[in-house]
Design a protein with these regions (language model features):
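Intrinsically disordered, low-complexity prosegments and terminal tails associated
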Residues: 1-224
């Protein structure tokens, strides 16, 4: 079976290679990152251009309430029709950086201060998002999510998070590593799989039980 290789840049700036069987295309690719400092924490989602419009049309219907620039990039604030939630999204050259608020749209100065506290570098392979020096924020978690048509999805955590996810017992061998079956919390009879490779790990959800052969051909590798 032919393989397809994804060369990605994570929110932290780390480089990730994911090798997948080439029989089905990747249908979506997104990332997430969370920052915290003291009692404060905030999370962001990163998707391709059009991510904001898709979310506000199909996920949680919302209308734009404000637009302004932060460090030369446009930020769009949208409020859900029921006013129970709102989103603010920074539009990059290749990607969009979104955060979600509870309740009505926040004031523009609050949103501007949040995005202004970040150093953002947008590459074709991914958006790098880091707290600016002096903010006292640190990156606590990051992940990259990949969906493959008719096969399933992978969630790849950052290397530091991955260490805590590896079971202590040996798993079943795959081409590049080993795999463990894990019961999905709160979903009787539903399972995910932890795929461990020499330089990375992924949580895999299969579209059907016949996807085990597909899973066995996946490799995940973070690079220094």
């Amino acid at each position: 079976m032919t393989a397809q290789r994804l060369e990605l840049v994570a929110p932290s700036g780390g480089r990730l290679t994911v090798t997948l069987p080439g029989d089905r295309p990747v249908s979506s690719l997104a990332a997430g990152v969370r920052f915290a400092g003291g009692s404060y924490g905030t999370g962001f989602q990163i998707g391709p251009r059009g991510y904001h419009d898709f979310a506000c049309t199909y996920v949680a219907p919302a209308k734009a309430r404000d637009r302004f620039l932060v460090h030369g990039r446009e930020v769009v604030v949208a409020e859900a029709d029921d006013r129970e939630s709102s989103v603010a999204t920074l539009i990059g050259t290749y990607h969009e950086l979104m955060t979600v608020y509870a309740g009505p749209a926040p004031r523009s100065d609050r949103v501007s201060a949040l995005f202004g506290s970040l150093e953002i570098t947008d590459h074709a392979d991914g958006m790098v998002v880091r707290p600016r020096a002096g903010t006292l924020l640190e990156t606590m978690a990051e992940q990259i999510a990949i969906v493959v048509k008719d096969r399933g999805s992978l969630s790849v955590p950052g290397p530091r998070q991955a260490l805590a996810m590896v079971p202590k017992h040996a798993g079943a061998r795959t081409r590049f590593g080993e795999v463990w079956k894990s019961a999905s919390p709160g979903a009787a009879g539903k399972y995910s799989f932890i795929l461990g490779c020499p330089a990375g790990l992924a949580e895999v959800h299969l579209a059907d039980a016949g996807g085990l052969d597909w899973l066995a051909e996946i490799d995940v590798a973070w690079h220094e």
